Amino acid sequence: MIGRALSCTGIFCAIILFSAVSAAFPVQDIQKSAENERDIMQDERVTMLLNELKEKNSDGVLDKKEVKELLELSKELFGDENVHVNGLCKVTGIGGGLVIPPYLPITPVLIAVGAILLDTEGTNGHWCHAVHLAIMIPFVGGPIFIPPYYVIIAGFAGAVIGIALS
């Protein structure tokens, strides 16, 4: 009971802190990459990756081979140092952007776009990175989108691919 109260308090404090920071430093377009001011969704590499994901997910299920091919394509498009991977992991994240689909507790593919601080702990160890694109296959948990641009992710995933655009 105390652990739940502390984790809820921590999430609540993180939301308040994120709200205060975003109010102090207004975000004109949260989907723009900080370094090069390009719209993330207009990047042809992101479009190619999402189209490949859509093609592979046409039957609603991604098997291990398809996930591995998606990971290889991600590393080819964005560079090995910009792609972070974990498997069978706990996922938490907070940031600004968009999560698709929001509010569904179980989904075969969850995509988060924007500026997201993503923390995972699983078979590949622990990593915490700021990413622009996160793909979680499959996802069980709470993907929450709070307008205008807040994203909160808490749950478990079979595979997580986090991509930082450079």
Regions found by a protein language model. Give the residues of each.
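Secretory targeting signatures
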Residues: M1-M41
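Generic serine detector
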Residues: S7, S19-S22, S33, S58, ...
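Residues at secondary-structure transition points
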Residues: I16, E66, P101-P102
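Mature secreted bioactive peptide module from preproproteins
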Residues: E76-S166
